[in-house]
Amino acid sequence: MHNLTIAEIIQGLKNKSFSSVEITQHFLNRIKTLDTEYNSFITLTEEQALAQATAADARLAAGDAPALCGVPLAHKDIFCTNGVRTSCGSKMLDNFVPPYDATVVTNYSQDGVVILGKTNMDEFAMGSSNETSYYGPVKNPWDTNCVPGGSSGGSAAAVAARLVPGATATDTGGSIRQPAALCGITGIKPTYGRVSRWGMIAFASSLDQAGTMTRTAEDAALMLQSMASYDRKDSTCVDHPIDDYSVNLNAPLAGLKIGIPKEYFGEGLNPGTAEAVQAAIKTYEAMGATVQEVSLPHTHLAVPAYYVIAPAECSANLSRFDGVRYGHRCDNPKDLEDLYRRSRGEGFGEEVKRRILVGTYALSAGFYDAYYRKAQQVRRLIKQDFVDVFSQVDVILGPTSPSPAFEFGSKGSDPVAMYLEDIYTIATNLAGLPGMSIPCGQVDGKPVGLQLIGNYFAEAKLLNIAHKFQTETDFHTQAPAAIK
């Protein structure tokens, strides 16, 4: 049953081939048996999941159930879950049990989704390898000596290992698309504001966006349909009509205009990755799309601008974790300053501390104009690059990551090398655009991701373009050798 897609599970539940309790128990048993190898889950909610599955079966029997009712999924451990620990991968929140659900969690609960547990992640979503988690690194199911990508590495590995058919995730600079690429699955980051951030623990508020991880674009459409909503509790959520993401999945691509940014095929791109992406582009041409080279001239400034803006926002957001109201609290503080210093020093990991310090420096009185203001000006130029390109083409294609999965520890001593893993994904977040990654090949037995970038609120078009590729190829059906 674990090889079934979400769409197939929905059909199986409808046909009574199995019950929600049966398939939920199957995945729970699989997680308990196999996840000692991958470490993709922080918390398993077995008792709650079986209760939800029982309720879903009753709802299905009554004949009035939403599409995802009874389907088992998992949440990245950044979404607040009422009564269930939400750690954000950090010692700081190791004992935090929220008294409420995030809007994303509520949306899925209302649709009768069964939640198997909370997935591992880089601490406070800061990382590109899932090596910064307080709960230990997640291993890539394709090669357990390699990272799964980050920060949503737990969700990506769990989906790739068939421990769960789909999972929620978040993307601040590539944290859905990059691990999706490295684990050979489908990941979508919607337009900024398409999905509520309420109850999603903040890293960089102007960049964070929730999305999904699945094996297919068809499944991504089903998950996004439930996730997307307008929410008054999130002031950045946009009141924009929500498309039916499944209805046009099979629309023909004849006449589709594809832009290929020349800046995405320069120095640093693995030759095998480039070859796989170029082959994918030829597949689209065979389906009737036209391809033209385009330019995003400020691409080289995306990483430096991001690593001023994101740490600055992180510095402000993480100031709330002071050991007073919730989160880690040091023992026997001498005074208030000692409480702050030791609680934060003990609660945060090295990468989080690094970004807080960088952000605080960038926001300080003497450097605000030189760094933060300048980075925001660059952000505006990057956004204009995309506006200009989308006046010529319908979608942008390129590599998701410069290389396939790398070995643990190979980039940890060089933060800049790690940051450059997101060189092709960061600009999309700075501009607030939707982006996807779908598998398009392999290099040395490890997956390669093709990135699709769309115009604002063009998620339905991206899903159509991704689905059509998956009807012509079988990369999305391939599984790691160890998966049975």
UniProtKB/Swiss-Prot annotation:
Q: Name one GO cellular component term.
A: glutamyl-tRNA(Gln) amidotransferase complex
Annotated keywords: ATP-binding, Ligase, Nucleotide-binding, Protein biosynthesis
Entry's EC annotation = 6.3.5.7
- A GO biological process this protein is involved in? translation
Q: Where is the signal peptide?
A: none
Active site annotated at which positions? K76, S151, S175
Please list the GO terms describing molecular function: ATP binding; glutaminyl-tRNA synthase (glutamine-hydrolyzing) activity
Q: What chemistry does it catalyse, as a reaction equation?
A: L-glutamyl-tRNA(Gln) + L-glutamine + ATP + H2O = L-glutaminyl-tRNA(Gln) + L-glutamate + ADP + phosphate + H(+)
- Its domain of life reads Bacteria
Q: How does it assemble?
A: Heterotrimer of A, B and C subunits.
Q: Which family does it belong to?
A: Belongs to the amidase family. GatA subfamily.
Functional summary from the UniProt entry: Allows the formation of correctly charged Gln-tRNA(Gln) through the transamidation of misacylated Glu-tRNA(Gln) in organisms which lack glutaminyl-tRNA synthetase. The reaction takes place in the presence of glutamine and ATP through an activated gamma-phospho-Glu-tRNA(Gln).
Name of this protein: Glutamyl-tRNA(Gln) amidotransferase subunit A
